[in-house]
Every structure is written in structure tokens, then in C-alpha cells.
Amino acid sequence: HRDLHSFPTRRSSDLLIQNQYQFIAVKFEESEQYRFEKALAQKPFLPEENEEEEVELANHLQTFGLIKRIESLPEQASKVILGISGGLDSALALLVSHQAMKRLGRDPKDIIAVTMPAQATSKNSNSIAKNLMSKLGVTALEIPIAESVDLHLKSIDHDTKDVTYENAQARMRTLILMDLSNKYGGFVLGTGDLSEIALGWMTYNGDQMSMYAVNAGLPKTWVQRLIRYHADHEYHVLKETLEKILQAPISPELLENQDT
């Protein structure tokens, strides 16, 4: 009761304090030729010095972090299950998973990589995803979701291609991955990066949800740089495919011709 009664008093005090502020108008001249005293980096998160060493260190941190996660699980629940779209984030997550299994002396077939094409999935993205999975020798599954999503949307009487339509696809993919983790004895590896997390560019109960988010500490520029690192080093055999991923427009492909 005391808090409720004191609310008007607090409000009056706040207004009194605001009235005591002194406002000073300051004018600035606008100039198109203005230059900052110090140049602003276009990619501020990437190292300016010892770049190769820093990138190699980032790769080790990702790989050994995932190894630690795998080792903490009972063997019958330690397979890696992840969705592959043919984009930057899922490609990096797959490469890190492959490195982790290799260092653990385990069969790459213990990585279950899943493509889940829908109406807006491009042939190029799907082809890239399949090529990656094939060359890495992982267990590759393709589970189309178009019919499942349509059935779900029909059940809630929704026929508009809007945010509901987009999120339904992301949630359907996560549902499939979670069920596969139970079926095959593993955990869902999240692929989203720090830029997406910071901007909220994800679907709750969709790609936001996983048991271990391997890219969560990396902004998109770092993801791109690490893909380049892998193309030039251990995964040189995948260089052509990884180059295609780097050059492709960034898109969630939840709507036709969608970009970011």
C-alpha cells in the first residue's frame, strides 16, 4: 500500500527535477566534406594486426568448445544434428563439427546434416548444401517441409505470406531437428551468429533454440572470414563451393527473392 500511495509523490518529484534542467541550444553546420579525425573501420570486429593468427585462434576456440560439449554428453546422445541451408552460418557450423569429430577420432557419419527445403528455397542453395554434405562424408538427410508447413497454416486458417508464414517454416525445421536428435541420439547444433542474435533476427522456438550454438560468439564478418580461412587451408578441396557461399546474397529464403 505504501508503494501505491507514494507513486504520485515520486512522479511530482521527477517533474520538479526536470524543471530544474537548463537547456542550451547548440548549432552545428552540416557539411558533406566532413571527415572524422580517426578513420572508421568497415569491419571493426576483425583484427587489424596478426590477422592470420587471430583467425586460426578463433577456429581453435570454436572447435575445442564443441569438442568439450560433445565430451560432456553420454556417447549415446553425442551425435551432432544440424540443419544445412547452403548459407554462411550453417556451412561454418558443419565445418567446425567435421573438425571436432576428426579430432575426437569419430566417424563423420556421427554428424547428421539435414536439408529442409520449402517453397522459397533456391536450387542454388540446396545444391551447395548437398555438395558440402557429400564431400565431407557426413550423414545427409533431406526432409522437404513445404507440405507440413501448408498443413499447419491451413489448420490455423492462415493463407497470407507474412511473418506467420516465415516463422512457421523456421519452427517446422527446429521441430524436425529436435525429433531427429531424439531418434538418433544426439543434440541440435545451433547455427545462428552474433549479428543475428544482437538484431533479434531469428524465430523464437525456431532457429533461436538449440542445445549448443557454435556461432553465437561470432558476428557475420567473422563467419565470412572463417569460411575464407577454411577454403584456403584444411578444406581447400571445398574451395569452389565455399567461394559460392561467400559470393551469394545473404538471405533466410523464407520468402521468394528475399534478402537482408
Regions found by a protein language model. Name each.
Residues 13-86, 90-260:
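ATP/NTP-dependent adenylation/nucleotidyl-transfer catalytic domains that generate, transfer
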Residues 1, 5-12:
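Short, small-residue-biased leader/transition segments that mark boundaries at the very start
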